[in-house]
Amino acid sequence: MNIKSALNRVVNQLDLTTDEMRDVMREIMTGQCTEAQIGAFLMGMRMKSETIDEIVGAVSVMRELASSVELKTLDGVVDIVGTGGDGANIFNVSTASAFVIAAAGCKVAKHGNRAVSGKSGSADLLEAAGVYLNLTPVQVARCIDSVGIGFMFAQSHHTAMKHTAGPRRELGLRTLFNMLGPLTNPAGVRHQIVGVFNQALCRPLAEVLLRLGSKHVLVVHSQDGLDEFSLAAPTFVAELKNGEVTEYWVQPEDLGIKSQSLYGLAVESPAVSLELIRDALGRRKTENGQKAAEMIVLNAGAALYAADHATSLKEGVALAHDALHTGLAREKLEELGAFTAVFKQENEA
C-alpha cells in the first residue's frame, strides 16, 4: 500500500493492517513521500487513533532500518526510557537511574535523544557530563561490555528519521513518532521500563512489545502525569511477563519509599540536571539531592526487576538503594565519560 491509498483509508477512519503500515512506513523512511503527505498521514493517524497492529508495523520498519548494536547476549540487558512530553521538566530520572542499574551489576543499553519539549534530554545530560555521544555501534557494545552501560544516540542509529523531522516540527503536536523511540532500541533489548505521557498508552504499548518479542517490560505512567515512577503519586503499570500483560497501581510506600512532593526536582537546563544528579549519587546529599536519590532508586529498582535481576519490585528497589548509596553509581557516570573519551580521540584522529 502506498501513502496516497493509506491517506484515503485513514481520513475515512479505517485502520491499516500491520503489513499495510509497514509498506507506508518504508515509503516515509526512505524519502519517497512529500512533507505534506507525511504531515497529513501523521495527523490523520492521530485523529483516528493508532492501533496495536499499526504501531507494530511502524516499529518493525524502524528497527529494520536502524544501525543495530550487536551484543554478546541480550539476557538481562535492560533499557529505561520515556516518551517525554509530560511537561514536568523533572531532572533526567531514567538516565540517572541507568547508572544505578549498572552499579547493581546489570547491563544497560540506554537509548535516548536530545530534548524536544523538555529542558534536558538524556543526550544533553550525558554530553554535559563529558560523555562522548557519536559512537559507532561497535563502540557502544564495548561500553556495555566493559563499563556495564552504553548510550545509543537515537539520531545516530535512526538516520531515516530525518525524513519526518520537518513535518513533525511544523505540526508541533504529539504524533505516532513520539511513541516509536522507546520501542526501537537499537540493541533489541527484551527487558525495559517504558514511561509514557498518557496512561491510556500503557497496555497497548505492552501488547506491541509482546508482539515484537519482548520478555519482561513495565510500561508506566504516574497519576501526577510523569512518564516514570513518581515519588509523589501512585504509578500505573502495564507489566509484560511470561507472555501476559497485567495492570496494577504502585505506591512508593509499597516499595519501602516514603511519598513526598516533587518540589525542587524540576530543572532549567542539562547543567542543572547534572548538578542535581551528582548530588543525588554522591555520599553527602542536600535535601533536594536526597529526594532525587529516592526518585532514582524507585525507577532503577523497577528496571532491575524488569531485567529479572530482582524477583520483585520491592527487592529491586532495595538493590538499587544499596548501589546508589555505596557511591558506585556516581563512579559509573565518571567511568563512562573516561571510556568514551578514548573513542572520541579515535574517531576524531
Swiss-Prot record:
UniProt GO BP: L-tryptophan biosynthetic process
Where, in this chain's numbering, is anthranilate 2 bound?
R168
Q: Which keywords does UniProt give here? A: Amino-acid biosynthesis, Aromatic amino acid biosynthesis, Glycosyltransferase, Magnesium, Metal-binding, Transferase, Tryptophan biosynthesis
Q: Entry's Pfam families?
A: Glycos_trans_3N, Glycos_transf_3
Q: Which residues bind Mg(2+) 2?
A: D227, E228
How the cofactor is bound: the record states: Binds 2 magnesium ions per monomer.
Tell me which domain of life the UniProt entry assigns to the organism this sequence originates from: Bacteria
Cofactors (names): Mg(2+)
Q: Does the keyword Amino-acid biosynthesis apply?
A: yes
The family database entries (SUPFAM superfamilies) matched by this protein are listed as: Nucleoside phosphorylase/phosphoribosyltransferase catalytic domain (SSF52418), Nucleoside phosphorylase/phosphoribosyltransferase N-terminal domain (SSF47648)
Q: What class of enzyme is it?
A: transferase
List of residues binding anthranilate 1? G82, N113
Task: List the GO molecular function terms.
Answer: anthranilate phosphoribosyltransferase activity; magnesium ion binding
Which E.C. number(s) belong to this protein? Answer: 2.4.2.18
Sections of the chain in a coiled coil: none
Q: Pathway, according to UniProt?
A: Amino-acid biosynthesis; L-tryptophan biosynthesis; L-tryptophan from chorismate: step 2/5
Q: Which reaction does it catalyse?
A: N-(5-phospho-beta-D-ribosyl)anthranilate + diphosphate = 5-phospho-alpha-D-ribose 1-diphosphate + anthranilate
How the protein assembles, per its UniProt entry?
Homodimer.
State the name under which the record lists this protein. Anthranilate phosphoribosyltransferase
Q: Which organism is it from?
A: Pseudomonas savastanoi pv. phaseolicola (strain 1448A / Race 6) (Pseudomonas syringae pv. phaseolicola (strain 1448A / Race 6))
